[in-house]
Curated annotation (Swiss-Prot):
Residues 515-542 are annotated as: Disordered. Glycans are attached at N86. It is found in: Basolateral cell membrane. One of its GO terms (biological process) is prostaglandin transport. Residues 1-20, 145-154, 198-212, 258-327, 376-386, 493-542 are cytoplasmic. This is Organic anion transporter 3. It comes from Pongo abelii (Sumatran orangutan). SUPFAM superfamilies: MFS general substrate transporter. Belongs to the major facilitator (TC 2.A.1) superfamily. Organic cation transporter (TC 2.A.1.19) family. It comes from the Eukaryota.
Length: 542
């Protein structure tokens, strides 16, 4: 008897599964608000130097830029030198008395004057948040293996709720960055546990649908944020509004059951059996649940227990040439996807279009993009889909370099197209990486690969600072990186309709078969298929 058959006995798609997926999905819906929050809480309005006390606000105080508007970071020295009759010859100085902001909405930029020489701090805040996700993945992944999925999920909900609320009351910018780091740390724990707990409790035939539903929760969450930001103009209240729900999720998570596989592998089979019987009773199959025994449960997971005893580390990813090449190519693709995604997702205000409408469009393009990706993965294959997604995204980003700023419509269309390609890349990478790595080292391979997408996400905001040297430099860097990531996919083997490798030896045999003349394809067993799982930047770990 397999675990899927045990799941069928207790109810594989009963009331429990639907409630379970809903409880896991609602936090993902709200998690998108935190990932993209700085689009609105760190918006930079039009601004100019505050005039000196007792000075008139006119051209004698504020020098005009090439566009006929006041310079944002300079003002004339006051009082003026009477010996210089031409105002263009007057000396200028930085904004010594602060700035005047042309906006009714406040943000961390207007509160702490993160403009001109301090504008780098705005990008630093987003990178600090991404660093929290990166460090959280490294720390909480190990803790999840030691203490279980549910405790990490529960603590992560509480951490995100508390640190998000703390950020709303931050008295200074450094304290705000500390809380944002902790927010990212909590998000990483939520992602890690949610993906595992979602997949385990649904049957194989329904995993694609349920994983699709979970993936779309993040997509639809992107529609909520613009509405909240429009209705709540104060950044502190907006920060608090998106954080409070996680206190509720913290309470509801106590209903979420622990991973059965983790319990059995940790020597807690009796507790696993109690949970299975509780699920059976909830699904109206109490008698079937009572018939289950510890012997059946252990026998079912015997293979997984044996695999768990085989210890593999990240160094094993570089032990054989094929595995080493795969790791390099996948890491580059993951890095490029996270790097390019956040260049567009967090650069909404750069296109000169209504911030709220464009964010809704950016979220909406994910819906058809993920659907097209599923079709492409099924019919064109993995490495073709992966290469196309990143190459098209890179091409769109590079094209932005050559489109004048006044052609806002063209620039917006290119940005939306590129944004749609990048979630497709995430979706493909999640499936592709799972299929390429052998079972005995799959979790390690996924962890290393996902580490690189977090590094890319963390570095992405910092690259925008190079725009101060030349405005086109950031898009050149983003675009070329995406093209390199797409090209790396051509060096990866195709996995469509191929059996999953269980051990490193299986992978070596797969490599030897690939060098032989092409024969009839091996029929893939249904039990070996990994479902297509739409993936997003907030669902980056498993």
């Amino acid at each position: 008897m397999t675990f899927s058959e045990i799941l069928d006995r207790v109810g594989s798609m009963g009331r429990f599964q639907f409630l379970h997926v809903a409880i896991l999905g609602l936090p993902i819906l709200n998690m998108a608000n935190h990932n993209l929050l700085q689009i609105f809480t760190a918006a930079t309005p039009v601004h100019h130097c505050r005039p000196p006390p007792n000075a008139s606000t006119g051209p004698w105080v504020l020098p005009m830029g090439p566009n006929g508007k006041p310079e944002r970071c300079l003002r004339f020295v006051h009082p003026p030198n009477a010996s210089l009759p031409n105002e263009t010859q007057r000396a200028t100085e930085p904004c010594l008395d602060g700035w005047v902001y042309n906006s009714t909405k406040d943000s961390i930029v207007t509160e702490w004057d993160l403009v001109c020489n301090s504008n780098k701090l705005k990008e630093m805040a987003q990178s600090i948040f991404m660093a929290g996700i990166l460090i959280g993945g490294l720390v909480l992944g190990d803790l999840s293996d030691r203490f279980g999925r549910r405790p990490i999920l529960t603590c992560s909900y509480l951490l995100l709720a508390a640190s998000g609320s703390g950020a709303a009351f931050s008295p200074t910018f450094p304290i705000y960055m500390v809380f944002r780091f902790l927010c990212g740390f909590g998000i990483s724990g939520i992602t890690l546990s949610t993906v595992i707990l979602n997949v385990e409790w649904v049957p194989t035939r329904m995993r694609a649908i349920m994983s699709t539903a979970l993936g779309y929760c993040y997509t639809f969450g992107q529609f909520i944020l613009p509405g909240l930001a429009y209705a709540i103009p104060q950044w502190r209240w907006l920060q608090l509004t998106v954080s409070i729900p996680f206190f509720i999720f913290f309470l509801s998570s106590w209903w979420t059951p622990e991973s059965i596989r983790w319990l059995v592998l940790s020597g807690k089979s009796s507790k696993a059996l109690k949970i299975l019987r509780r699920v059976a009773a909830f699904n109206g199959k109490k008698e079937e649940g009572e018939r289950l025994s510890l012997e059946e449960l252990k026998l079912n997971l015997q293979k997984e227990i044996a695999l768990a005893k085989a210890k593999y580390t990240a160094s094993d990813l570089f032990r054989i040439p094929m595995l080493r090449r795969m790791t390099f190519c996948l890491s580059l693709a993951w890095f490029a996807t996270g790097f390019a995604y956040y260049s567009l997702a967090m650069g909404v205000e750069e296109f000169g279009v209504n911030l709220y409408i464009l964010q809704i469009i950016f979220g909406g393009v994910d819906v058809p993009a993920k659907f097209i990706t599923i079709l492409s993965l099924s019919y064109l294959g993995r490495h073709t889909t992966q290469a196309a997604a990143l190459l098209l995204a890179g091409g769109a980003i590079l094209a932005l370099t050559f489109v004048p700023l006044d052609l806002q419509t063209v620039r917006t269309v290119l940005a939306v197209f590129g944004k749609g390609c990048l979630p497709s890349s995430f979706s493909c990478l999640f499936l592709y990486t799972s299929e390429l790595y052998p079972t005995v080292i799959r979790q390690t391979g996924m962890g290393v690969s996902n580490l690189w997408t977090r590094v890319g996400s963390m570095l992405s905001p910092l690259v925008k600072i190079t725009g101060e040297v030349q405005p086109f430099i950031p898009n050149i860097i983003y675009g070329i990186t995406a093209l390199l990531g797409g090209s790396a996919a051509f060096f990866l083997p195709e996995t469509l309709n191929q059996p999953l490798p269980e051990t490193i030896e299986d992978l070596e045999n797969w490599s030897l078969r690939a060098k032989k003349p092409k024969q009839e394809p091996e029929v893939e067993k249904a039990s070996q298929r990994i479902p297509l799982q739409p993936h997003g930047p907030g669902l980056g770990s498993s």
